[in-house]
Design a protein with these regions (language model features):
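Right-handed parallel beta-helix
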Residues: 133-266, 281, 289-293
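Sec-dependent, cleavable N-terminal signal peptides
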Residues: 1-38
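Extracellular beta-strand-rich solenoid/capping regions of secreted or surface-exposed proteins
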Residues: 61, 65-69, 81-95, 103-140, ...
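C-terminal accessory segments
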Residues: 124-131, 135, 450-505
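Acidic Gly/Asp/Thr-rich repetitive segments characteristic of extracellular carbohydrate-active
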Residues: 44-81, 86-87, 127, 489, ...
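Conserved functional hotspot residues at active sites or interaction interfaces
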Residues: 515
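Predominantly extracellular beta-rich ligand-binding scaffolds that present long acidic/polar faces
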Residues: 83-95, 105-112, 177, 208, ...
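Acidic glycine-/aspartate-rich tracts in secreted/extracellular proteins
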Residues: 46-50, 71, 77-81, 99-106, ...
Length: 525
């Protein structure tokens, strides 16, 4: 994917965001009062009857059966269970708000932290099922202990026989707004049989299929498992099929497993995506595992086909073979921090079709023996473009490792702290075009390309994961115009006499510096 296409995706998603922002304002306006609005239904774990008023709340299933498109359901504190395949089934565009204080009169007050509302699958069923061309909202709920074993509707079939998808939330062909929830302790599949004829679980916490315009924002997705006894794909969440305009933003995706076994058929401990063009922005993806032995693919992020846009995410402390894996991808990977992962490789690209990926303004650091790797195939040669990236090792391994059938363009790159800086193991079938690369503290720089620079980048505090450029950095004003107008923090390029190398454009001393973790991750998550 070229830079112009990356820009067009950002513009289209930004315009879609204006509509969604306006929608959130409408949904989050003044609180309705007791049953004066006929579209408000009130629910409690001990509710009864069909009045569903603030003074006389009803049961959850009663309210769901009475609700019409546009209605708002307020759920009081407590635990709600269900029967059958799911705790709740949504086929209308309604809103479910957790955290209602249960007051029988007066203004409706919500505080999900003070009045936790739990939808409990009891490890016996999926928690939430959403289907159809609808736009429901889930806000302020705890979605827990779901189990989708045997629920194979809408599951992929390419990685063994499916045996369950979406333990916490399953959405197929819908456009849900899933915001400010805790999605915890769910499993997509428990069955064991063995890959490739066996079973695969998809999306332990959340599964979206053909969910264009979906919004998944401000959630904590924690301790979910895709495949508890066999192959697994997407421990935290799995995105599949058409997802144009879908937005996965400002979530905390923590301590999820693609599979809890030692099997290598493990893809995407945190977030896994298939074909589609979702925006995945500003998420913290931390402490996830691809499998129990730390192998598998994409411990933090995994993409297989598609053209997603990953921007401003923090991927750290994940365990597996690669922290980020993009296969057959045309994605834009921009402004991300991939740091301190317990992996063999920080980021790997694998094959390409209909154009390749573009990486802009990323920091990939201390995430295994190889910081960046690229692999192609004679039938699917990989072409990739890297602009303004900072690649830092732990004193050993490879900075850039290229296998066969790869064409790689590197511009304004920092490569520091490796045994080998840039290397190609198959120079007869692969080509690396490196221009304006800063080399530092590598035992062997390897392929230096054109206009190489030697010198200390003077990162501000690399021991603490801060790879912003400090005073006297050899990267200052040493680059070339690569068509990149901002840096990893959104600051303008250039700020000095020329373009700085790597992901950061150093700010003038009079401007306030903020540590990197505060930029991509909202403080209110």
């Amino acid at each position: 994917m070229n830079l112009d296409k990356c820009r067009s995706i950002v513009f289209a998603l930004a315009m879609g965001g204006l509509f969604l922002a306006a929608l959130f304002v409408l949904l989050g306006g003044a609180s309705p009062v007791a049953r004066a609005d006929p579209g408000s239904l009130f629910i409690s774990p001990t509710g009864s009857g069909t009045e569903c008023s603030q003074a006389n709340p009803c049961a959850l299933q009663t309210a769901l059966s009475l609700a019409n498109d546009g209605d708002i359901l307020y759920l009081a504190q407590g635990t709600y269970t269900g029967t059958g395949a799911a705790v709740i089934t949504l086929t209308r565009s309604i809103t479910l708000y957790g955290g209602w204080d249960g007051a029988p009169s007066g203004p409706v007050t919500r505080d999900p932290a003070a009045y936790p509302t739990v939808l409990d699958g009891e490890r016996a069923r999926r928690v939430v099922y959403i289907s159809g061309d609808i736009t429901p909202t889930l806000d302020g709920l705890i979605i827990a202990r779901g189990n989708a074993t045997g629920l194979t509707e809408g599951c992929p079939t390419s990685s063994g026989n499916p045996d369950g998808c979406g333990g916490g939330i399953f959405a197929y062909g819908a456009h849900p707004l899933i915001v400010n929830n805790i999605i915890s302790d769910n499993v997509a599949a428990l069955t064991t049989a063995g890959y490739p004829t066996g079973t695969t679980g998809y999306g332990g916490g959340l599964y979206l299929r053909d969910a264009d315009r979906a919004v998944i924002s401000g959630n904590v997705v924690i301790s979910n498992v895709a495949g508890a006894a066999d192959c697994g794909n997407g421990g935290g969440m799995f995105l599949f099929g058409a997802a144009e305009g879908a937005r996965i933003e400002a979530n905390r995706v923590l301590s999820n497993y693609a599979t809890t076994t030692n099997m290598s058929c493990a893809w995407g401990g945190g977030i896994s995506g298939g074909p589609g063009g979702a925006l995945i922005r500003g998420n913290l993806v931390e402490g996830n595992w691809s499998n129990a032995m730390g192998t598998g693919y994409g411990a933090g992020l995994y993409q297989w086909y598609g053209a997603a846009h990953y921007v401003g995410n923090v991927v750290r402390g994940n365990r597996g073979r690669r922290a980020v894996y993009l296969g057959y991808s045309r994605s834009c990977f921009e402004g991300n921090w991939v740091v301190d992962n317990l992996t063999n490789e920080g980021l790997q690209l694998y094959n390409s079709i209909d154009g390749g990926p573009t990486l802009i303004n990323n920091v990939i650091a201390r995430s295994g023996g190889t910081t960046f790797a690229a692999y192609g195939h004679v039938a699917y040669p990989l072409t990739a473009t890297l602009l303004h990236n900072t690649l830092v090792g732990s004193g050993s391994g490879y900075g850039v490792y290229v296998e066969d059938y790869v064409t790689l363009f590197l511009t304004n790159t920092i490569v520091a702290g490796h045994t080998w800086g840039i290397t190609s193991t198959y120079p007869t079938s692969s080509t690396i075009f490196a221009d304006h690369t800063l080399f530092w503290a590598n035992a062997h720089d390897g392929l230096r390309g054109t206009n190489p620079i030697d010198g200390d980048p003077r990162f501000l505090n690399p021991a603490a994961g801060d790879y912003h450029l400090g005073p006297g950095s050899a990267a200052l004003d040493a680059g070339v115009d690569a068509g990149v107008a901002t840096d990893i923090d959104g600051d303008a390029r250039p700020m000095g006499a020329g373009y700085d190398l790597g992901a950061d454009e150093a700010e003038p001393s009079y401007r306030l510096y903020l540590p990197f973790i505060r930029s991509p991750i909202p403080e209110d998550l």
